[in-house]
Design a protein with these regions (language model features):
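N-terminal and secondary-structure boundary signal
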Residues: 1-200
Length: 200
């Protein structure tokens, strides 16, 4: 597999140049202007954040990407799948409340929020994972599968199991329905190698 190209911009701004303009330059440098968005439904997959948390990309970045897509004839929407754990994103009603409270509304971003795996996280599509060692079929949120184009808008963060999380986790785990997340997490159960166990 070919290595991915990584495009970088810093947060330093000066009069006349803001972070949203820098993001648009980044989208152009990455070649996103070569994508045929005309008439296409475009899922912008991101993490809306838990209520009271600030560890998510700000809505103005989502607006920049949505405006970029709309300027090229696309029809964007913001999306994520429900979570397994107890929190403010475990069902679509609470998830949308969290999105709106954290600033991701149609008024601030210029596009709608659709929870990809439905009201209770059961609206999914089984996708075969060719050569999958741990998962043979991935259960992906239906709205992601129904979109013509998917854009991953991701923040980079530390992760307790993987070391760090980013674009792969945003799509791989974040794109999974609640049932899909359950299957992925179930494979990570600890097991005891009895011959090496010291009974600690």
């Amino acid at each position: 597999m070919e290595q991915a190209k990584v495009f970088f911009t810093d947060f330093r701004c000066h009069p006349g140049v803001n972070q949203q303009q820098k993001l648009e330059k980044l989208l152009l440098a990455a070649g996103m202007d070569t994508i045929d968005f005309e008439g296409k439904i475009v899922a912008i997959k991101l993490h809306f954040g838990e209520v009271g948390n600030l560890a998510y990309l700000r809505p103005n970045y989502a607006k920049t990407v949505a405006d970029f897509v709309k300027a090229r004839g696309g029809r964007p929407f913001l999306t994520d799948c429900n979570t397994l754990y107890i929190g403010s994103r475990k069902n679509a009603l609470e998830h949308m409340d969290a999105a709106y409270l954290n600033g991701f509304s149609p008024f601030s971003t210029g596009c709608h929020v659709i929870i990809a795996d439905g009201l209770r996280g059961g609206d999914d599509v089984e996708v075969p994972v060719v050569g999958g060692e741990y998962v043979k079929y991935a259960k992906i949120g239906r709205a992601l599968m129904d979109a013509d184009i998917v854009i991953s808008l991701t923040h980079f963060k530390g992760h307790e199991q993987a070391g760090y999380g980013g674009a792969l986790k945003n799509l791989g785990m974040g794109g999974g329905s609640r049932a899909g997340k359950m299957e992925m997490h179930a494979k990570g159960k600890p097991h005891v190698i009895t011959s090496k166990c010291v009974g600690c």
